[in-house]
Amino acid sequence: MVSIRRSFEAYVDDMNIITVLIPAEQKEIMTPPFRLETEITDFPLAVREEYSLEAKYKYVCVSDHPVTFGKIHCVRASSGHKTDLQIGAVIRTAAFDDEFYYDGELGAVYTADHTVFKVWAPAATSAAVKLSHPNKSGRTFQMTRLEKGVYAVTVTGDLHGYEYLFCICNNSEWMETVDQYAKAVTVNGEKGVVLRPDQMKWTAPLKPFSHPVDAVIYETHLRDFSIHENSGMINKGKYLALTETDTQTANGSSSGLAYVKELGVTHVELLPVNDFAGVDEEKPLDAYNWGYNPLHFFAPEGSYASNPHDPQTRKTELKQMINTLHQHGLRVILDVVFNHVYKRENSPFEKTVPGYFFRHDECGMPSNGTGVGNDIASERRMARKFIADCVVYWLEEYNVDGFRFDLLGILDIDTVLYMKEKATKAKPGILLFGEGWDLATPLPHEQKAALANAPRMPGIGFFNDMFRDAVKGNTFHLKATGFALGNGESAQAVMHGIAGSSGWKALAPIVPEPSQSINYVESHDNHTFWDKMSFALPQENDSRKRSRQRLAAAIILLAQGVPFIHSGQEFFRTKQGVENSYQSSDSINQLDWDRRETFKEDVHYIRRLISLRKAHPAFRLRSAADIQRHLECLTLKEHLIAYRLYDLDEVDEWKDIIVIHHASPDSVEWRLPNDIPYRLLCDPSGFQEDPTEIKKTVAVNGIGTVILYLASDLKSFA
């Protein structure tokens, strides 16, 4: 990049507004009138406003002749001094968006005879594509400007395996950039790569998933999942680890894919697998990263591939992994990061269309609601198109089954609804959910895709942090405790969560329908439940802490809504007290498969809870109206919640179900309603292999969950 020296500056800030900035010391020399010059003529600029700034003098001018984007313009002062006209705030106006919105295909479109390269760069005055091949000499092809600010060129020949970069001239400066739409990239994402469509056959097509509340989501990080020395997997830290079947720990316990299948979850959610920064793909074990540093949104990450130097390998192995999971009845959710990029100034977005894809504050500075230095301006039409195009691509090319949206609240509602429409048309039955936090980005509250606006986004789920904190205590206050940790003040909030957070008694609904409530007590973010509890209750022994975590898991897995489990939570995962392990070592982040063996009984307990939920629709009521009709709270005390699912003849094979959650080590006797005998399926000691008949009262001995049922066939149990 060559630095341009300018005697003064001029910017297009609206379709016919040009701002001229004169150095303060040159104010008496470079004076109005100003003229706008094109290659063939010039026009007068009328000064509408003028201001004295700290080091410059500002003139706001109006042109009767709108700027022709894609052409070189200059502004000349009365002194004869000239400067090139740069793209300013006009890039962020609705008029610009409307004039240059393009609904066609972008990127490299391959055929065996030729490849068409297209890039959307409406502010650019010139563009080219630079092609190279490891075994051949490179060439640069000038691109032609088409309508809507698209530059294109068709290059003949079979370009499979060719590397390419776009060269874009904005504001008189040439920049090389990777294609925003690159479907494959070289090692560490330095160039895009043209690949012919592969011949991957999906051998296990799954029917559209029935309903979000039927899901049990299991979140994991590819490297965490397999890197432990006792994981039993050969391809540690790689896509292929999840293609290995029947793996075991050293002592013969199931691990890997076999373990997840045995656990009974329905969906595996993977932390980002698109190309990200933070890990050198040539030396992947030298650093660690969760993957929330997005570089290239359409291309798979190379550090998880067996050969990061071969762009095809990462595509093939990722597809093999997804296909294998499908063969075993497991669906795949991708964690995607459309709210920010790794580094704004180096991103293909900024290099291609400076200032367009990111939000700016009222002073024209990049906003930082995400906390990482930039916010994607999803409300702009080409950003909206990009997000929808990307989601549809992963559905169609990689056959994934849903998306978890990082910092969903940064995005705007219209984009989320547009994306949902395109995505569900591409693949019905997918899950779409995310973090609906209300963050400080310059977007009106009513436009944010935040939890508070859930009623306007049917079909979109939200992480329910209120339910989470009611169960375990405030996530951001280490010593804070929730119901499962002995804080009886949270009982009512927990009961609201159990009822799907969609309105219980006089409480205002958090979400309008249970399918929009993602119920969890632990995720990759923040402390694990075990670590949080160890800080909050340092006096308690491990046995009692295990009981409390089992209680928390039972609350979530039996609640109305969509349950979500963090991998290893079922065997009390610890990160040694590290709160934010996004770039901590493998020793902190790895899934410790030794604990899977140590806590076999607890894993079995979680498996039985999942099995119970899947077997009985009463725990998966599909609407708020159904919950109001079939769920009632029987007891709500400081350390005891009892609720009943009833009138289930048309819902479940069980007629009646009672669940009791008890958070005190004391023993209590709880009286059954209506003196009807129930079968005791589960108590704090675990599941009963032969449920016994209970009359009048049931003993609740210590911390844990009691499950009773009434069926026409009293021998029926999960």
UniProtKB/Swiss-Prot annotation:
Q: Does the keyword Transferase apply?
A: no
Cite the InterPro entries for this sequence: Glyco_hydro_13_cat_dom, Glyco_hydro_13_N, Glyco_hydro_b, Glycoside_hydrolase_SF, Ig-like_fold, Ig_E-set, pulA_all-beta, PulA_N1
Substrates-to-products reaction catalysed? Hydrolysis of (1->6)-alpha-D-glucosidic linkages in pullulan, amylopectin and glycogen, and in the alpha- and beta-limit dextrins of amylopectin and glycogen
Q: Which residues form a coiled coil?
A: none
Q: What is its EC number?
A: 3.2.1.41
Question: Site feature Transition state stabilizer: at which residues?
Answer: D525
Q: What is this protein called?
A: Pullulanase
What positions does UniProt annotate as the active site of this protein?
D406, E435
Q: Name one GO biological process term.
A: carbohydrate metabolic process
Q: Which UniProt keywords apply?
A: Glycosidase, Hydrolase
Pfam families, sorted: Alpha-amylase, CBM_48, pulA_all-beta, PulA_N1
Q: How does activity depend on pH?
A: Optimum pH is 6.0.
The enzyme class is hydrolase
Q: Name one GO molecular function term.
A: pullulanase activity
Q: Does the keyword Lyase apply?
A: no
**Activity under varying temperature:** Optimum temperature is 40 degrees Celsius.
Spell out the family assignment given in the record's similarity comment. Answer: Belongs to the glycosyl hydrolase 13 family.
Source organism per entry reads Bacillus subtilis (strain 168)
